[in-house]
Swiss-Prot record:
Its cofactor is dipyrromethane. GO terms for molecular function: hydroxymethylbilane synthase activity. Belongs to the HMBS family. Pathway: Porphyrin-containing compound metabolism; protoporphyrin-IX biosynthesis; coproporphyrinogen-III from 5-aminolevulinate: step 2/4. This is Porphobilinogen deaminase.
Length: 313
């Protein structure tokens, strides 16, 4: 294989740059002499910080500009947080690598209280996620959920300024940015089921670029990929973007996948849950099966209501 340059399209946020640098280091380690450069870009989701994500159209909000760079040959690969990646790709692009997953759990962050259970009634909790909101209010309907957007630093600064009693963030982002000491406690997946793909990094590239596919192969983590494939299949079957109250999480038990799924009203009034097991070779079928279970329980009505409130189909 000829030595060549790989250009990585990435968002400019600290977490996105960390992910791109991580992929850069892994590629350089796997292929000595390979030149890897970053092409930082600003996505629509990075520009629109004054509105809830669900109201500005969640699907592809953080990836479209990166995909355009791939299609225009301004970059060779795009590095994404898997929970932000839409279910369908533009013609000519595809997902060709999923890296090993970091901690997939949600993190409880507070300067005053040790855990979610310790929060007094009426406490203000910040999150930008309807998925987290639904599960939080189902457990603690006495809490006030307030809108929280911005990068990790901005969110922590708002907490430190006293705007919130606690905030909920993805543990993976805090760990990757060196803020592990800010995690007051992690919330178990039983209490807050993660978003599909949470904690995993995916790499998108041109479908015809087989040389790039080969360079990415050493970074692919099959165990993570099978879990994420099941989660994404559930999301796709429910027509879910990254900003709807859908949660799903798969674990490997030997050669079996166990997938749990959840759809909840943002008010926490109703939480629908389903789970199933299947061989890891049937990850996609498993995702559809659990999604069908949720639909049979009434998930479609909940999701239609959420999409209607957000003002998009």
């Amino acid at each position: 294989m000829s030595t060549r340059e790989i250009r990585i399209a990435t968002r400019k946020s600290a977490l996105a740059l960390w992910q791109a640098e991580y992929v850069k280091a892994r590629l350089e380690q796997a292929h000595p002499g390979l030149l890897v450069t970053l092409v930082p870009m600003v996505s629509r989701g990075d520009k629109l910080l004054d509105a809830p994500l669900a109201k500005i159209g969640g699907k592809g909000l953080f990836v479209k500009e990166l995909e355009t760079a791939l299609l225009d040959n301004e970059a060779d690969i795009a590095v994404h947080s898997m929970k932000d990646v839409p279910m369908d790709f533009p013609e000519g692009l595809g997902l060709y690598c999923i890296c090993e997953r970091e901690d997939p759990r949600d993190a409880f962050v507070s300067n005053t209280f040790d855990s979610l259970e310790a929060l007094p009634a009426g406490s203000i909790v910040g999150t930008s996620s309807l998925r987290r909101q639904a599960q939080l209010l189902a457990r603690r309907p006495d809490l006030q959920i307030r809108f929280l957007r911005g990068n990790v630093n901005t969110r922590l600064a708002k907490l430190d300024a006293g705007e919130y009693d606690a905030i909920i963030l993805a543990a993976a982002g805090l760990i990757r940015l060196g803020f592990e000491d800010r995690i007051t406690s992690t919330i178990s997946v039983d209490d807050s089921l993660p978003a599909g793909g949470q904690g995993a990094v995916g790499i998108e590239c041109r479908s015809a670029d087989v040389e790039i596919h080969a360079l990415l192969a050493p970074l692919h983590h099959a165990d993570t990929a099978d879990r994420v494939v099941a989660e994404r299949a559930l999301n796709k079957h429910l027509n879910g973007g990254c900003q709807v109250p859908i949660a799903c999480y798969a674990v490997l038990e030997g050669d079996q996948l166990w997938l749990r799924g959840l759809v909840g009203q943002p008010s926490g009034g109703t939480l629908l849950v389903a789970d199933a097991r299947a061989p890891r070779t049937a990850a996609e079928t498993l995702g559809v099966q659990v999604a069908e279970d949720l639909l049979s329980q009434g998930a479609e009505a909940i999701l239609k209501e959420v999409y209607g409130e957000a003002g998009h189909p």
